Curated annotation (Swiss-Prot):
<dbReference type="GO" id="GO:0000774">
    <property type="term" value="F:adenyl-nucleotide exchange factor activity"/>
</dbReference>
<dbReference type="GO" id="GO:0042803">
    <property type="term" value="F:protein homodimerization activity"/>
</dbReference>
<protein>
    <recommendedName>
        <fullName>Protein GrpE</fullName>
    </recommendedName>
</protein>
<feature type="compositionally biased region" description="Low complexity">
    <location>
        <begin position="50"/>
        <end position="62"/>
    </location>
</feature>
<dbReference type="Pfam" id="PF01025">
    <property type="entry name" value="GrpE"/>
</dbReference>
<keyword id="KW-0143">Chaperone</keyword>
<feature type="compositionally biased region" description="Basic and acidic residues">
    <location>
        <begin position="28"/>
        <end position="49"/>
    </location>
</feature>
<comment type="subunit">
    <text>Homodimer.</text>
</comment>
<dbReference type="GO" id="GO:0006457">
    <property type="term" value="P:protein folding"/>
</dbReference>
<dbReference type="GO" id="GO:0051082">
    <property type="term" value="F:unfolded protein binding"/>
</dbReference>
<comment type="function">
    <text>Participates actively in the response to hyperosmotic and heat shock by preventing the aggregation of stress-denatured proteins, in association with DnaK and GrpE. It is the nucleotide exchange factor for DnaK and may function as a thermosensor. Unfolded proteins bind initially to DnaJ; upon interaction with the DnaJ-bound protein, DnaK hydrolyzes its bound ATP, resulting in the formation of a stable complex. GrpE releases ADP from DnaK; ATP binding to DnaK triggers the release of the substrate protein, thus completing the reaction cycle.</text>
</comment>
<keyword id="KW-0346">Stress response</keyword>
<dbReference type="InterPro" id="IPR000740">
    <property type="entry name" value="GrpE"/>
</dbReference>
<comment type="similarity">
    <text>Belongs to the GrpE family.</text>
</comment>
<dbReference type="InterPro" id="IPR009012">
    <property type="entry name" value="GrpE_head"/>
</dbReference>
<feature type="region of interest" description="Disordered">
    <location>
        <begin position="28"/>
        <end position="78"/>
    </location>
</feature>
<dbReference type="GO" id="GO:0051087">
    <property type="term" value="F:protein-folding chaperone binding"/>
</dbReference>
């Protein structure tokens, strides 16, 4: 829609420029016609007064020529002023048209770059939803593997599940999936989401004391933040006491 609107504006500028050029040409033609008419009138005046007495003829001829010259001069001056105004308008319209054209070209180039970047990102992160949906059953599998048991048969099954879990993690790592480090790390709202807070003056302030749910990066983009329990001193002065 934006490009269509800008194209309409450019078309309007072209139309206005053509109209101004047409007016300019008409004014030039009018000036030529006025000059020709003045010359013809002077010739007619000379023929009209040929047969009159010399003094009267000379006086009238001088007066007529003087008036004719003044009228012609005024008309020419007026036309020259109009031509100058039209030239200025034409120059301004051309400048506006050129600036609009350059602006549209720059915006179109930027639009192509944004569209290309968006397309590349869509391809790059096309598997985001699939991987995110895969993480939940993978974490459930980890909980099953970590379950303590004395049953030898069950332990063999759990060993097989553990090998499967490692293979899945390896595939995810190869695709660019990374686990966000959070335990005992300073709380960072960019990567961590605090579900619980505790106050323990034996531990550093604003530190993650426990991971409630693992967080992951996918090709350096946050796939989901880590849910943590954060140590937050309710009164820092109390520790000094």
């Amino acid at each position: 829609m934006f490009l269509e609107k800008e194209q309409d504006n450019l078309d309007n500028l072209k139309t206005q420029t053509k109209e101004l050029h047409k007016d300019y040409t008409e004014c030039q033609n009018c000036q030529k016609e006025e000059t020709q008419t003045t010359n013809k009138d002077n010739q007619k005046e000379d023929e009209t007064f040929k047969n009159q007495p010399n003094k009267t003829k000379q006086t009238n001829t001088k007066q007529q020529k003087h008036l004719s010259k003044e009228s012609s001069h005024q008309q020419i001056t007026k036309l020259q002023t109009q031509i100058k105004e039209l030239q200025q308008k034409l120059s301004q319209q051309k400048k506006t048209f050129d600036e609009g054209l350059l602006k549209n070209q720059a915006e179109f180039i930027n639009f192509k770059k944004r569209a290309q970047t968006q397309k590349e990102n869509e391809l790059k992160y096309a598997s985001s939803n699939f991987i995110n949906n895969l993480l939940m059953p993978l974490e459930q599998l980890e909980k099953v593997i970590d379950m303590p048991t004395q049953n030898e048969l069950l332990q063999k099954y759990l060993l097989g599940f553990k090998l499967l879990q490692k293979q899945i993690k390896k595939v995810l790592q190869d695709e660019g999936v990374e686990e966000i480090e959070a335990l005992n790390k300073p709380f960072d709202p960019t990567f961590h989401h605090a579900l619980e807070t505790v106050c323990d003056f034996e531990k550093p302030d604003k530190t993650n004391l426990a991971v409630l749910q693992k967080g992951y990066l996918y090709k350096k983009r946050i796939l989901r933040p880590t849910l943590v329990k954060v140590n937050e001193w309710s009164d820092k002065n109390e520790k000094n006491e």
